[in-house]
């Protein structure tokens, strides 16, 4: 969308470009740290690794970055940008080439959240000659990151293959063997067929395929104020089964045709699929009656009144019956569309008039298929008491269809 610092500086509205040189210099794997240098961006941390960042542009709601447009290579990347915009999936920035941030009027052609802005992640381009590389780092808490790529371009055919592995043992532990870490895998492949660069009518067709997955022993359960003050990295025993599993695939086919007279047309068709199941603690029971169940929010807001629930949550009190209620928040997302952009540079007097017109049809869907399981707890160890019926909790399908278009003009 921008492509350089120069384009960002000369953009209408506010735009910022994090160049490949800057990303390479700091070597971050967390988008939260990358965006700290960008004015007008507010972020609050959640897991400490940037797996699911909460980004706000110009004061918009930060939770799950659901009020900004998240894109990869100019294509909407959130699981369901219109039907369910909460970004439980976020592209792995450790494999990105550059980051572009647009706020307010500078991003009207990207939508759907034109009030806040857009964050576009530019993936690694196909190299013009043979390139291969390997980058590895290791840090505290068994945090490991490795990235490998291989690509080249021969006459009229280019290709690129990338692999990323990102993992950590985590730092929220009650005992040494407790699982609180995560791992991520990400594979991306590109194939490009193109004409000669100096052809009278230059054309290119690029296919991009991607697959990624994640397993993280992450929990929604926090701490009471007293526990946070005394042991901020503590994790309650009632959250030991909490985990998130995800799978994501992406397909994009992009065609470019450029004429010598200054006319260029870029068209992309895309499809993204995302599946997640966040298996997490919802409620705690001290008995079988309706009034003997409390949500985690209620318990931690008033731990003194809910002392019996806290004892079960922390594992200091055994309960052999139905004690801990976990919900499998299983959801699948489908996102697809086609978009085209026409650019024309017209000489006028002693300057140029740059015209840009674009249109996009987009459709997405969220399908919820959830259930609850109940666990007992004894000696600080949880065991399954009763398995729930798949699809027995808060199921629904949400769909959205959208058409957007724009026309921009600029003197230069």
What are these regions (language model features)?
Residues 1-24:
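Short, acidic, small-residue-rich periplasmic hinge/interaction motif at the N-terminus
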Residues 6, 77, 124, 139-141, ...:
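Structural signature of outer-membrane beta-barrel domains
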Residues 23, 35, 99-100, 119-121, ...:
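Non-catalytic regulatory/gating segments with a bias toward low-complexity or hydrophobic composition
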Residues 32-79:
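Extracytoplasmic beta-strand/coil segments of soluble accessory domains associated
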Residues 75-103:
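Short acidic/polar hinge/loop motifs at secondary-structure boundaries
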Residues 84, 131-135, 171-179, 183-184, ...:
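Extracellular loop and loop/strand-boundary signature of outer-membrane beta-barrel proteins
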Residues 131, 138-167, 175-219, 243-247, ...:
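Transmembrane beta-barrel wall of Gram-negative outer-membrane proteins
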Residues 198-206, 246-412:
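Face-selective signature of the C-terminal outer-membrane beta-barrel domain
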């Amino acid at each position: 969308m921008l492509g350089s610092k120069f384009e960002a500086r000369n953009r209408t509205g506010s735009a910022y470009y994090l160049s490949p040189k800057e990303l390479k210099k700091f070597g971050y794997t967390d988008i939260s740290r990358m965006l700290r240098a960008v004015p007008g961006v507010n972020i609050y941390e959640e897991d400490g690794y940037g797996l699911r960042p909460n980004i706000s542009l110009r004061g918009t709601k930060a939770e799950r970055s659901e009020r900004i447009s998240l894109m990869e290579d100019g294509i909407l990347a959130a699981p369901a940008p219109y039907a369910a915009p909460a970004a439980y999936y976020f592209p792995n920035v450790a494999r990105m080439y550059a980051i572009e941030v647009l706020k307010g009027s500078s991003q009207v052609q990207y939508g759907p959240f034109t009030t806040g802005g857009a964050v576009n992640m530019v993936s690694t381009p196909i190299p013009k000659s043979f390139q291969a590389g390997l980058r590895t780092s290791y840090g505290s808490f068994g945090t490991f990151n490795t990235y490998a790529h291989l690509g080249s371009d021969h006459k009229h055919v280019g290709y690129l293959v990338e692999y990323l592995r990102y993992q950590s043992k985590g730092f929220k532990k009650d005992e040494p063997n407790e699982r609180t870490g995560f791992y991520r895998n990400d594979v991306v492949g590109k194939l490009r067929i193109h004409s000669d660069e100096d052809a009278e009518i230059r054309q290119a067709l690029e296919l991009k395929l991607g697959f990624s997955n994640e397993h993280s022993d992450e929990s929604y359960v926090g701490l009471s104020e007293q526990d946070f003050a005394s042991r901020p990295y503590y994790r309650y025993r009632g959250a030991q089964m909490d985990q998130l599993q995800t799978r994501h695939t992406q397909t994009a086919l992009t065609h470019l045709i450029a004429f010598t007279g200054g006319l260029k047309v870029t068209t992309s068709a895309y499809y993204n699929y995302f599946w997640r199941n966040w298996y997490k603690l919802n409620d705690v029971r001290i008995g079988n009656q309706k009034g003997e169940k409390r949500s985690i929010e209620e318990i931690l807001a008033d731990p003194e009144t809910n002392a019996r629930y806290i004892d079960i949550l922390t594992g200091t009190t055994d309960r052999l019956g139905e004690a801990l209620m976990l919900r499998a928040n299983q959801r699948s997302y489908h996102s697809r569309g086609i978009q085209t952009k026409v650019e024309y540079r017209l000489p006028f007097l002693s300057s140029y008039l740059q015209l840009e017109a674009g249109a996009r049809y987009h459709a997405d869907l969220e399908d919820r298929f959830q259930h609850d399981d109940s666990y007992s707890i004894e000696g600080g160890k949880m065991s399954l008491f009763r398995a729930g019926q798949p699809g027995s909790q808060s199921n629904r399908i949400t769909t959205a269809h959208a058409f957007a278009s724009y026309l921009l003009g600029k003197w230069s």
